[in-house]
Amino acid sequence: MKILYLLFAFLFLAFLSEPGNAYKQCHKKGGHCFPKEKICLPPSSDFGKMDCRWRWKCCKKGSGK
């Protein structure tokens, strides 16, 4: 029975992370999601959280250092 619970949880998580739907707002601005600890250079390229996952932020591509 435990195996069924684990299998269901795995399948549920697999369908949640479809790459086609990930971070559309950030990508439309030419950005990419980085961990919040990363510094966006220049600071004007930091778009904030937008639609990135929890504790991540959107920076213009190539600016995450």
Curated annotation (Swiss-Prot):
Motif segment (Nuclear localization signal): 24-40, 49-61
Tissue specificity as recorded in UniProt: Expressed by the venom gland.
Signal peptide: 1-22
Subcellular location: Secreted
Swiss-Prot/TrEMBL site (Involved in the interaction surface toward Kv) positions: 23-24, 55-56
SS bonds (residue pairs): 26-58, 33-52, 40-59
GO terms for MF: potassium channel regulator activity; toxin activity
GO cellular component terms, semicolon-separated: extracellular region
GO biological process, one term: defense response to fungus
Keyword Secreted on entry: yes
UniProt KW keywords: Antibiotic, Antimicrobial, Disulfide bond, Fungicide, Ion channel impairing toxin, Myotoxin, Neurotoxin, Pharmaceutical, Potassium channel impairing toxin, Secreted, Signal, Toxin, Voltage-gated potassium channel impairing toxin
Function, in words: Cationic peptide that possesses multiple functions. It acts as a cell-penetrating peptide (CPP), and as a potent voltage-gated potassium channel inhibitor. It exhibits antimicrobial activities, hind limb paralysis, and severe muscle necrosis by a non-enzymatic mechanism. As a cell-penetrating peptide, crotamine has high specificity for actively proliferating cells, and interacts inside the cell with subcellular and subnuclear structures, like vesicular compartments, chromosomes and centrioles. It penetrates into the cells as fast as five minutes after its addition to cell culture medium.
Miscellaneous remark of the record: Negative results: has no hemolytic activity. Has low harmful effects on normal mammal cells. Does not show activity against the filamentous fungi A.fumigatus and T.rubrum at concentrations up to 125 ug/mL. Does not directly affect voltage-gated sodium channels Nav1.1/SCN1A, Nav1.2/SCN2A, Nav1.3/SCN3A, Nav1.4/SCN4A, Nav1.5/SCN5A and Nav1.6/SCN8A.
Record family assignment: Belongs to the crotamine-myotoxin family.
Record note on quaternary structure: Monomer.
Name of this chain's protein: Crotamine
